[in-house]
């Protein structure tokens, strides 16, 4: 923004008429004057003729895309999500098949005398209690430091390390098995780590941050729009439309990656979850992009309305005159974000598809249909 307001004007002023040099002659024939967007005009005319129907259909489509979000599950990805043709992944599959739980066991660090009879008894009780749960825990192994003051207990967990089976086994270990065995040792302190524990704890930390970030971003965006346009309706509607865009993008990501609908096309193995950091990342980035489009379009609509146009004419003028810019920017971003879907890393695929889908949805369904339809319906309330 600083560069656009300072460096860009200075450079353009310095260049003067020379900025026109280097134009490609043939491309000038395809340019159309502002306000003559025929494609968006064909879309916009029926929307403004039947705003209630258009708004209903657009909302229904966004809600349908967002429905998978209700089943969103987050977990860290691992080598198992990468293409099976990679030698490392093949080796990991063989290890997991031959030694279930060994590639990603739970590791318990225990601060106690590891040579004591009480400690050895507690470890034996832990093994018996783990076997009694019938959850598929593996055989326990124990080692300690040279001074025998800190022990390390390794116990293989069932599942692939990030699925529900592994998570439930981890919670049982932390909440029931360890307190009933190791936790009874006098003066003992212990903690559970390992790949599954790291993934679970990171996931829980991200979940706890979501409400705070959501509340701050929504409130901040609402207040900025309220200050800019002096309208509660415009500010509230912008927040709602942006939330619909984000929810629809979440739904696409969940369907493609968590449900595994895109496995064959994008060449990955679903772990039944999406990356823990992705919901927060997508929300912040997409809300900013959506708000940018929204303010850009509304500014043109307001300018037209202030010049004496009716609400319907101002909306049509604002959409048509900004459609080319919004569409071009959206296509560039969709193309750039889609590149991430070609990478072998699952998190990058999720980010690319999520961003590309959200920008495409926002620039078409939301800005070209839902926004003008709701503005026409609200009339002077805008």
Task: Outline where the language-model segments fall.
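Structured non-transmembrane domains adjacent to transmembrane bundles in polytopic membrane proteins
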Residues: 71-263, 295, 347
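Membrane-embedded transmembrane helical bundles of large multi-pass transporters/channels
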Residues: 1-74, 187-188, 195-382
């Amino acid at each position: 923004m600083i560069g656009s307001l300072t460096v860009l004007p200075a450079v353009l002023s310095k260049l003067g008429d020379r900025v026109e040099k280097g134009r490609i002659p043939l491309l000038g024939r395809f340019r159309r004057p502002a306000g003559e967007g025929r494609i968006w005009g064909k879309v916009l005319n029926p929307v403004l003729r039947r705003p209630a129907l258009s708004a209903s259909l657009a909302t229904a489509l966004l809600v349908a895309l967002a429905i998978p979000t209700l089943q969103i599950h987050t977990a860290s990805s691992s080598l198992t999500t990468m293409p099976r043709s990679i030698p490392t992944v093949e080796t990991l599959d063989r290890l997991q098949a031959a030694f279930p739980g060994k590639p990603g066991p739970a590791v318990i660090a225990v601060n106690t005398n590891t040579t004591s009879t009480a400690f050895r008894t507690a470890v034996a009780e832990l093994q018996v209690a783990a076997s009694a749960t019938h959850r598929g825990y593996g055989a326990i192994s124990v080692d300690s430091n040279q001074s025998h003051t800190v022990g390390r207990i390794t116990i293989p967990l069932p599942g692939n390390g990030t699925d529900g089976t592994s998570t439930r086994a981890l919670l049982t270990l932390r909440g029931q098995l360890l307190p009933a065995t190791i936790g009874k040792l006098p003066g003992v302190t212990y903690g559970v780590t390992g790949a599954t524990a790291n993934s679970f704890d990171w996931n829980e930390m991200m979940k706890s941050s979501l409400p705070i970030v959501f509340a701050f971003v929504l409130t901040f965006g609402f207040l900025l729009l309220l200050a800019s346009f002096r309208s509660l309706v415009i500010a509230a509607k912008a927040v709602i439309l942006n939330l619909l865009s984000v929810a629809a993008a979440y739904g696409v990501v969940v369907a493609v990656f968590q449900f595994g609908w895109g496995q064959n096309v994008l060449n990955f193995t679903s772990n039944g979850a999406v990356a823990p950091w992705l919901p927060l990342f997508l929300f912040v980035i997409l809300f900013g992009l959506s708000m940018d489009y929204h303010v850009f379009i509304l500014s043109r609509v307001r300018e037209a309305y202030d010049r004496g146009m009716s609400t319907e004419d101002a909306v049509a003028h604002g959409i048509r005159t900004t459609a080319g810019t919004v569409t071009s920017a959206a296509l560039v971003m969709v193309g750039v974000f889609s590149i991430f879907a070609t990478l072998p890393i699952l998190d990058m695929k999720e980010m690319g598809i999520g961003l590309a889908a959200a920008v495409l949805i926002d620039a078409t369904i939301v800005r070209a249909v839902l926004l003008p339809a709701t503005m026409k319906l609200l009339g002077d309330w805008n």
